[in-house]
């Protein structure tokens, strides 16, 4: 039985990020009254002692791990060590502390890139570790696989409610719009917007445009987390996505239309394509009772509206070696 109730104390690690902030809003809207969070400057989750002290002083009933070193294809390939090591440090500290201090529920967020590059589509949870990973993000993927396995091991050995959710590519309010480190969707919104403002100049996009990606609006992802808080899920690993995908070229044309840009699109073949396709099989979480609501076009319009309101003060994610 699920031991969590509306007054349970819930610590959202990464509560200022795109996903963490959406989870905070969704839990509040669902009636949860005792949410806590710390910024990375208040609590560096790479520091094991600091994490242990914080959890000992707060005694949360639930930890949601939405803190990570996150970035798009270029950031992942240029900073392999940070994507591997920082993510291992953050998640190991949170998972091990949660286990040792008897936190009742732990929700780990991974990513669809944990699955093999050429796994059969749509990707089922049980194709994990059946083949090689996509090279542009294998470092990040290895960290995330380790997190999934750590939660699975704790669940198996100690029968605890530690569960992993694997989101597909996410987008929405509070996304990262920095053109070097962002994912494709926010990058396209910014590029087409700025090109339109500059008199419909050409927009340069990366790769060939042929890879396929699935996109989930962040508020739908947050509802999946609320679902995992509200229910004791019977298995350790669940994919979270829409179950449909588009080519990067189709995404570009949709965003170009939403923004009303009328210039050319140039494809920069020097930039990587990444994995050809990573469509999620989401039947397990759907079967348990969760489903997405926001279609891609609607989500793009919402995100563009958010961008227009906030782009003067957007966060700039800088990575240093
Ligand atoms: N964005 C996407 O497309 C996808 C994301 N995910 C997963 O979802 C989760 C959230 O991602 P998203 O919201 O997009 O990422 P963001 O970059 O928006 O947020 C990440 C958060 O992690 C926190 N953080 C990073 N390093 C540290 C640290 N050393 N100590 C404390 N906090 C730290 C940051 O805190 P602060 O702001 O205080 O610095 C930030 O709030 C991640 O696990 C990611 O892997 C999975 C699939 C796709
Ligand atoms: C969520 C997921 O995100 C990452 O994987 P990815 O899906 O390959 O990342 P992406 O969103 O950055 O790119 C998707 C596609 O889009 C193309 N593309 C075109 N033009 C731009 C462009 O302007 N910017 C970016 N970033 N990509 C572009 C790009 O070449 C690629 O073909 C993982 O590293 C990993 O972190 C992970 O789990």
Where are these regions (language model features)?
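C-terminal substrate-binding subdomain of Rossmann-fold SDR/epimerase-dehydratase oxidoreductases
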Residues: 13-18, 22-30, 194-321
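Short-chain dehydrogenase/reductase
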Residues: 84, 88, 136-148, 178-186, ...
């Amino acid at each position: 039985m699920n031991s969590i109730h509306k007054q349970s104390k819930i610590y959202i690690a990464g509560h200022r990020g795109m996903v963490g902030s959406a989870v905070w809003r969704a839990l509040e809207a669902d009636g949860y009254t005792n949410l806590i969070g710390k910024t990375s400057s208040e609590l560096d989750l790479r520091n094991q002692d600091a994490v242990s002290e914080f959890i000992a002083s707060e005694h949360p009933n639930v930890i949601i791990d939405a803190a990570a070193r996150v970035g798009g294809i270029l950031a992942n390939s240029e900073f392999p060590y940070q994507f591997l090591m920082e993510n291992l440090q953050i998640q190991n500290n949170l998972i091990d502390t949660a286990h040792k201090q008897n936190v009742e529920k732990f929700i780990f967020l991974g990513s669809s890139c944990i699955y093999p590059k050429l796994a059969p589509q749509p990707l089922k949870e049980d194709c994990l570790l059946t083949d090689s990973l996509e090279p542009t993000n294998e470092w990040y993927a290895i960290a995330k696989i380790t997190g999934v396995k750590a939660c699975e091991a704790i669940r198996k050995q100690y029968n605890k409610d530690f569960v992993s959710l694997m989101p597909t590519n996410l987008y929405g309010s509070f996304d990262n719009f920095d053109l070097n480190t962002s994912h494709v969707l926010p990058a396209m919104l910014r590029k087409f917007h700025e090109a339109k403002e500059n008199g419909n100049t050409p927009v340069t996009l990366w790769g060939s445009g042929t890879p396929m990606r699935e996109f989930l609006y962040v508020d739908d992802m947050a509802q999946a987390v609320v679902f995992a808080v509200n229910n004791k899920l019977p298995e350790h690993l669940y994919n979270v996505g829409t179950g449909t995908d588009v080519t990067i070229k189709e995404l570009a044309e949709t965003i170009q239309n939403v923004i009303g840009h009328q210039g050319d699109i140039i494809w920069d073949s020097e930039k990587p394509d990444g994995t050809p396709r990573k469509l999620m099989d989401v039947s397990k979480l759907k079967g348990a009772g969760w489903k997405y609501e926001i279609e891609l076009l609607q989500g793009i319009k919402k995100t563009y509206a958010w961008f227009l309101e906030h782009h003067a003060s957007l966060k700039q994610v800088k990575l240093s070696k």
